[in-house]
Curated annotation (Swiss-Prot):
Loss of function: phenotype: No visible phenotype under normal growth conditions, but mutant seedlings are hypersensitive to freezing.
Lineage of source species: Eukaryota, Viridiplantae, Streptophyta, Embryophyta, Tracheophyta
Protein name: WD40 repeat-containing protein HOS15
GO terms of molecular function: double-stranded DNA binding; transcription corepressor activity
SMART domains: LisH (SM00667), WD40 (SM00320)
Functional summary from the UniProt entry: Acts as a repressor of cold stress-regulated gene expression. Interacts specifically with and promotes deacetylation of histone H4. Plays a role in gene regulation for plant acclimation and tolerance to cold stress.
GO cellular component: Cul4-RING E3 ubiquitin ligase complex; nucleus
Length: 613
């Protein structure tokens, strides 16, 4: 018979402490016992292994005590012991207890027999039983009448709630109608203003026709020179290490090209443009998300005195600013018909374009940090502080599978295709998971700090990651080690983005690149194939929290805690537009046309910038 080694026992106790939430005790035992040096595969040890092991031992002692007792008939009922007796006594003491118990049972049986023989009131007892049965029947009928009354009360309450819901729907319908009327009115005003602007521009064009012709000639010469230098799109030239800094010709975005969206009462943590309409979603620490209807075209064509209306998606029934319901992340589905939000209460919510809450998804036991729709739109993926990722079946409004691989909070998730995805965590690990599989399809190890962000390239063959260890890495699904280790940053890298160029994009003939934003105040651009830095954009003075490529891949927008948004020309390697607000910037994003940029600020505002070059 094989025996349990001390190393195996230590590991079982270590796992028990972890599963029971005794984190510090588990850490101490793991350190002193050298758990991390053992060869035991933790994935092969099922949850609750120590408890099952101890229970089996107790059952064995119980069977030994019963079967080894010669005074006990094995055909009789099996006798059970209290767990404390099994732990504190040996087999002989248990057998003595069993014999004593049997003797008492025999004595009690004899006493019952004598009682039956001497009992002369058997008939009276039968009469008492009948009376008790009648009383019980009467009591049951009384309870049935009470249940009927409670059922009627519940039905009345449901009817009252139904009426209240109908009233609430009517109020919401009226608010939506007002919102639509206001939107139509703004659209009409915008069209009129655009027409007037066109007339003015026509006059200006006629006045400066000669000057424009001269400018056009010069632009053609410059463009031709650029093409000759670049080899007209040739890929034969070696990439160069270029460090770019802002120039004195930086163009500050005028106030006429800016709209400040006010309404949130706490810092705005996330924003995202709809992929199908001119709608902007924002999520805030005030326990609300908002859907803003942004006018199309230039802001100059829209009356400056008009506010931009928003639908308010309340995550708390009472007052806002409930910190447990901070909206930390949000994402539109591919069709732009549904918005998903994740919050600090551990719940994901799904909303319609009209601001109607259609699903509340509850499974996590901690705040949700990341949330993504798959391309098909049938699954929603969430990552939480509770160290798990959950795939939700949106149509069924229920969780399909929970993935519990990480030993620390899950910081980011990203779909590779409709059924597989990557997760990253504070435990420095990256896992490739697949729906229906109970173990990771692949494990990527190499980072020495928290992995803040993971992103798949447009083809789903390369995975980029960034970490507090000041590195970004590029991984290939065909191997477990990283393909490129990008080490030019000097501080933590907070986020990364793939360019919308190369295979699998709308710009297939352009080079695929990776951009990274760091606490060292820089944005760096990398050659994805060679793993070499192409250029470093040095213009911010504080950590850079967010960056986004324009849809055509020609520009990068970056947002920093220095309150500034810089828009960089990748071709020229310099800032071409900039805007400074009143708070640190947590996220920036482009609309699908590439003519507007949104940013969310720590001063409770959302900013939308017109961008035209």
């Amino acid at each position: 018979m094989s025996s349990l080694t001390s190393v195996e026992l230590n590991f079982l106790v270590f796992r028990y402490l972890q599963e029971s939430g005794f984190t510090h005790a588990a850490f101490t035992l793991g350190y002193e016992a050298g758990i991390n040096k053992s060869n035991i595969d933790g994935n092969m040890v099922p949850p609750g292994a120590l408890i099952k092991f101890v229970q089996k031992g107790l059952q064995y002692m119980e069977m030994e005590a019963n079967l080894s007792n010669s005074e006990v008939d094995i055909d009789e009922d099996f006798s059970f012991f209290q767990p404390l007796d099994l732990i504190s006594k040996d087999v002989k003491e248990l057998q003595d207890m069993l014999r004593e118990k049997k003797r008492k049972e025999r004595d009690m049986e004899k006493e019952r027999d004598r009682s039956k023989e001497n009992d002369k009131g058997v008939e009276r007892e039968h009469e008492g039983d009948r009376n008790r049965a009648k009383e019980k029947d009467r009591h049951e009928k009384q309870k049935e009448r009470e249940r009927e009354r409670e059922k009627l009360e519940r039905e009345k309450e449901r009817e009252r709630e139904k009426i209240e819901r109908e009233k609430e729907r009517e109020r919401e319908k009226m608010e939506r109608e007002i919102f639509e009327r206001e939107k139509d009115r703004l659209k009409l005003e915008k069209e009129r203003e655009i027409e007037r602007e066109r007339e003015r521009e026509k006059i200006e064009r006629e006045k400066s026709h000669e000057k424009q012709l001269g400018d056009a000639d010069r632009e053609m010469v410059i463009d031709q020179t650029d093409k000759e230098i670049a080899g007209d799109g040739s890929t034969g030239a070696e990439p160069m290490d270029i460090v770019m800094t802002p120039t004195s010709q930086t163009s500050h975005i005028p106030n006429s090209d800016v709209r400040i969206l006010e309404g949130h009462t706490s810092e705005v943590c996330a924003c995202a443009w709809s992929p199908s309409a001119s709608l902007l979603a924002s999520g805030s620490g005030d326990a609300t998300a908002r859907i803003w209807s942004i006018p199309e075209g230039s802001f100059k064509a829209v009356h400056t005195g008009r506010n931009i209306n928003a639908l308010i998606l309340k995550h708390a029934k009472g007052k806002s600013n409930e910190k447990s319901k901070d909206v930390t992340t949000l994402d539109w589905n591919g069709e732009g018909t549904l918005l998903a939000t994740g919050s600090c209460d551990g719940q994901a919510r799904i909303w319609t374009l009209n601001g109607e809450l259609i699903s509340t998804l509850s499974k996590h036991k901690g705040p949700i940090f990341s949330l993504k729709w798959n391309k098909k739109g049938d699954y929603l993926l969430t990552g939480s502080v509770d160290r798990t990722a959950v795939v939700w079946d949106v149509k069924a409004e229920e969780w399909k599978q929970q993935f519990e691989f990480h030993s620390g909070p899950t910081l980011d998730v990203d779909w590779r295709n409709n059924v597989s995805f990557a997760t990253s965590s504070t435990d420095s690990m990256i896992y490739l998971c697949k729906i229906g599989e109970t173990r990771p399809a692949k494990t990527f190890t190499g980072h020495q700090g928290e992995v803040n962000c993971v992103k798949w390239d447009p083809t789903g063959s390369l995975l980029a990651s960034c970490s507090d260890d000041s590195t970004a890495k590029i991984w290939n699904i065909k191997q477990s080690t990283f393909v490129h280790d990008l080490r030019e940053h000097t501080k933590e890298i907070y986020t990364i983005r793939w360019s919308p160029t190369g295979p699998g994009t709308n710009n297939p003939n352009k080079q695929l690149t990776l951009a990274s934003a760091s606490f060292d105040s820089t944005v760096k651009l990398w050659d994805a194939e060679l793993g070499k830095m192409l250029c470093s954009f040095n213009g911010h003075r504080e950590p850079v929290y967010s960056l986004a490529f324009s849809p055509n891949g020609e520009y990068i927008a970056s947002g920093s805690l220095d309150k500034s948004i810089h828009i960089w020309s990748i071709k020229e390697g310099k800032i071409v537009k900039t805007y400074t607000g009143n708070g640190g910037i947590f996220e920036v994003c482009w609309n699908k046309e590439g003519n507007k940029i949104a940013a969310c600020f720590a001063d409770n505002s959302v900013c939308v910038l017109d961008f035209r070059m």
